UniProtKB/Swiss-Prot annotation:
InterPro entries: MADS-box/MEF2_TF, MEF2-like_N, TF_Kbox, TF_MADSbox, TF_MADSbox_sf. Disruption phenotype: Triple mutations in the SEP1, SEP2 and SEP3 genes result in the replacement of the stamens and petals by sepals and of the carpels by a new mutant flower with sepaloid organs. The gene is SEP1. PANTHER family: SERUM RESPONSE FACTOR HOMOLOG (PTHR48019). Probable transcription factor. Functions with SEPALLATA2/AGL4 and SEPALLATA3/AGL9 to ensure proper development of petals, stamens and carpels, and to prevent the indeterminate growth of the flower meristem. Forms a heterodimer via the K-box domain with AGAMOUS, that could be involved in genes regulation during floral meristem development. Expressed mainly in carpels, and weakly in stamens. Residues 3-57 form the MADS-box domain. It is found in: Nucleus. Residues 88-178 form the K-box domain. Pfam families: K-box (PF01486), SRF-TF (PF00319). One of its GO terms (molecular function) is RNA polymerase II transcription regulatory region sequence-specific DNA binding. This is Developmental protein SEPALLATA 1.
Amino acid sequence: MGRGRVELKRIENKINRQVTFAKRRNGLLKKAYELSVLCDAEVALIIFSNRGKLYEFCSSSNMLKTLDRYQKCSYGSIEVNNKPAKELENSYREYLKLKGRYENLQRQQRNLLGEDLGPLNSKELEQLERQLDGSLKQVRSIKTQYMLDQLSDLQNKEQMLLETNRALAMKLDDMIGVRSHHMGGGGGWEGGEQNVTYAHHQAQSQGLYQPLECNPTLQMGYDNPVCSEQITATTQAQAQQGNGYIPGWML
């Protein structure tokens, strides 16, 4: 009679279970060896008993190399397929982060412009006030520095204009000195004659325009013989001093 069909279930008898494990383990190791030799295949077999004892077989010289090869073949494709998904997930997280930062900056800008201040509490309002004060101080400082720079430029331009004016004045004085020197050396007699004539006319003008010493209390329309005599005497004296000739209406 042949062997009956063995039911595949856990052997409850401990001794029978250990005997069956030893027989089948040796048969499995033998089959792995035969497969590697007959088919020139790289075979690795790892067995752990129920007590945790290790049994292994490897057709190559190093079990770790076979395990690395198995890991690359089994999980490498999964990592390659999951790489775009991971990159997409990371990109989406970065997008959410940048979006939140952008919305926060927009909210801060509106708050600086005095908008959307209702949701802010007292602490946030104080912080916003300090931020505005700092910005205002910085703007004033930059404005003051700009005005000081402009003032310095204007002072430099003023100094340059003063130096230019001083140089032109010195040049003008030199030109006047040279001209006076030439005139004094070539036309002495003509210059003296012009001076005498100018003095003569000046004396006449001063004599003609001397004030008349009349009584200021005299009224218009009343003849005063004393004042008339004084006017006549003064006019005759001035005419004699001027050219020695007395007009007929004065006689």
